[in-house]
């Protein structure tokens, strides 16, 4: 499930134009060498998720947070720098497993990649994640360029959405192993650019091995989950905690927020408004579990 708005399309287009004018082209790494990876903070702490902010002027910093997650296309390098200067760890949202028609790179997705309509977002389509392993893969190049966009804006980590196409695409076209292999590929691609990366949802997959033989909980640098308390699936998130990595969770119905239970597992859980808007917007809601009771 993703929560973000169409107005990011215009902002994203301007960002792509700016990168082009500054000499960035798809497939090019500015400066040649990539930076060292900085992992996200471990342990219990406050964080926020504002990927649905109408625009970046609506983004704000709640007191006491250490990490913030924002949209790749809708957030400027200047905003990222400001947040980092304030001491925040910055995470970059991209949609890895779906086609979104309003993104500035949407024209790069051929029809053959689109396997099924997302019932929650009917203008979108789940993509064929197997494509990244094919020669001259279109999807691999699109996603690598999105990762470069995150890196070039100064983000330290990435949140890739829709890593459950084995469940989302009808007819069993994408197998469980196909999906796990794709997730592992994303982790490797992010790390190659000096970006940390969160597993998005799929707590049942944390101990599965990709084609390199490594478990997802060993490859990813943390996990960001939605509604694990509502669906009683938080326990697997503790695999990340045991590895010294952060586990983040959001509930969209406050009655399911169980702070004592989250703390026992080492999970950073909070209640958020459904559309994850910016802190300065009227619809913004956030009730976070305190790191200590």
Where are these regions (language model features)?
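N-terminal Sec-pathway targeting helices
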Residues: 1-10
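Core hydrophobic alpha-helical transmembrane segments of single-pass membrane proteins
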Residues: 9-17
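C-terminal region of N-terminal signal peptides and the immediate post-cleavage residues
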Residues: 17-35
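Glycan-processing catalytic domains of CAZymes
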Residues: 30-293
């Amino acid at each position: 499930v993703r929560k973000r708005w169409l107005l990011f399309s215009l902002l994203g287009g301007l960002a792509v134009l700016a990168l082009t004018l500054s000499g960035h082209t798809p497939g090019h790494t500015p400066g040649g060498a990539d930076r060292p990876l900085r992992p996200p903070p471990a342990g219990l702490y406050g964080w926020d998720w504002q990927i649905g902010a109408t625009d970046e002027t609506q983004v704000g910093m709640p007191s006491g947070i250490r990490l913030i997650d924002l949209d790749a296309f809708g957030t400027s390098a200047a905003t990222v720098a400001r947040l980092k200067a304030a001491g925040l760890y910055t995470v970059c949202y991209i949609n890895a497993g779906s086609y979104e028609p309003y993104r500035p790179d949407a024209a790069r997705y051929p029809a053959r990649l689109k396997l099924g309509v997302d019932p929650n977002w009917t203008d979108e389509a789940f993509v064929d994640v197997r494509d990244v392993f094919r020669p001259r893969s279109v999807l691999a190049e699109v996603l690598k360029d999105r990762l470069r966009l995150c890196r070039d804006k100064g983000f330290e980590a990435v949140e890739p959405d829709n890593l459950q196409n084995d469940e989302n695409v009808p007819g069993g076209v994408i197998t469980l192993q196909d999906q796990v292999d794709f997730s592992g590929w994303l982790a490797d691609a992010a790390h190659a650019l000096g970006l940390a990366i969160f597993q998005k949802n799929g707590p049942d997959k944390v101990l599965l091995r990709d084609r390199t033989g490594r478990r997802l909980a060993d490859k990813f640098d943390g996990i960001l989950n939605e509604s694990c308390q509502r669906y009683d699936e938080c326990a697997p998130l503790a695999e990340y905690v045991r590895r010294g990595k952060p586990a983040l969770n959001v509930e969209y119905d406050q009655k399911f927020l169980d702070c004592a239970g989250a703390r026992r597992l080492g999970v950073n859980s909070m209640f958020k408004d459904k559309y994850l808007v910016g802190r300065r917007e009227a619809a913004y809601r956030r009730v976070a579990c305190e790191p200590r009771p």
